[in-house]
Design a protein with these regions (language model features):
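The feature marks the mature, well-folded catalytic cores of soluble enzymes
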Residues: 1-289
Length: 289
């Protein structure tokens, strides 16, 4: 439980660059307010418009960016440092290979998410879908090449790939699984955890896609699921005497925030069942505490 390696490495890079001199992160480095507040406290600037970058050094977020965007930043004289998660890089490479092989690109994910924008900007005409209805609106093409946003539930991705293949049986549909392993592991662990708890607390940033998906997964197995960003959001009314409470967290959530929620929960004198803390941050194993 806690940060995955991609998020951790991105934060370390931002810390290194801020220690070396003025630096701007183009966008939210990760979708967690505690992390962003810490970066600001270290003097890191956060800007969302490339034209508004006041420093020579600029960091690309863990969610990645298109080749076109990075080339534009370099052409404007900026020194670009990529904090892109390696598994997001892998998704970019997979999509490029599919397009080079003659497949029409399709990305399964949130169209307005920064990771998805980074995937699609280099491929004009790329389709983005996140529901069966959106798949059904796609025009028929002879060949589809499919990847997904790395934090989508793999079961949902498979469902939409199957839907695409069933809708166009004469078309060739080639799917490269780009859902990251930490997401898969955490989804599996969260589902198991939710199945044996009365209440589940999901800790993560309000704009974190992988946290949102964890909430959805937990709600499929448990009727009382609450999404909170920190211990300050914990409502005693959520927990009844004798409840077994599970804790899980998004892959951009710092251990310190999770520890704070767990401490607040224990202070409420309820039984707590949380994911094992002895596992590496990139993995999740749900066990009784």
């Amino acid at each position: 439980m806690g940060m995955c390696f991609g998020v951790r490495d991105a934060i370390e890079l931002a810390h290194e660059r801020s220690a070396a001199g003025p630096v701007t992160v183009l966008g939210d480095l990760v979708h967690n307010e505690a992390v962003l507040s810490d970066l600001r406290a270290r003097g890191v600037l956060i800007r969302h418009d490339p034209a508004d970058v006041p420093t020579r050094d600029v960091v690309i977020t863990a969610h990645g960016a298109s080749d076109r965007r990075i080339a534009g930043l370099k052409a404007s004289g900026l020194q670009v440092f990529e904090a892109t998660c390696p598994l997001v890089h892998r998704a970019h490479q997979a999509l490029r290979r599919l397009v080079a092989a003659g497949f029409h690109p399709v990305v399964i994910g949130q169209a307005d998410h920064v990771e998805v924008r980074g995937l699609t900007e280099d491929h004009p005409g790329c389709e983005v879908v996140l529901s069966e209805e959106e798949v059904d609106r796609l025009p028929e093409r002879p060949r589809y090449g499919v990847v997904s946003q790395t934090t989508q539930p793999v079961s949902r991705v498979r469902q939409l790939v199957d839907r695409l293949a069933a809708r166009f049986p004469a078309s060739e549909v080639r799917w490269t699984d780009t859902v990251c392993q930490p997401t898969k592991d955490r989804q599996t662990a969260a589902e198991a955890l939710a199945g044996r708890c009365d209440v589940v607390l999901v800790v993560g940033g309000a704009h974190s896609n992988n946290t949102r998906r964890l909430v959805d997964t937990c709600r499929s197995r448990c009727g009382r699921v609450h999404w909170l960003q920190s211990a300050a959001d914990l409502d005693p009314a959520w927990v009844r005497e004798g409840d077994t409470v599970g804790i899980t967290a998004g892959t951009s959530t710092p251990d310190s925030v999770i520890d704070g929620v767990e401490a607040a929960l224990r202070a409420m004198s309820c039984r707590s069942r949380s994911e094992a803390r002895s596992q590496p941050p990139s993995e999740t194993r749900a066990k009784a505490a």
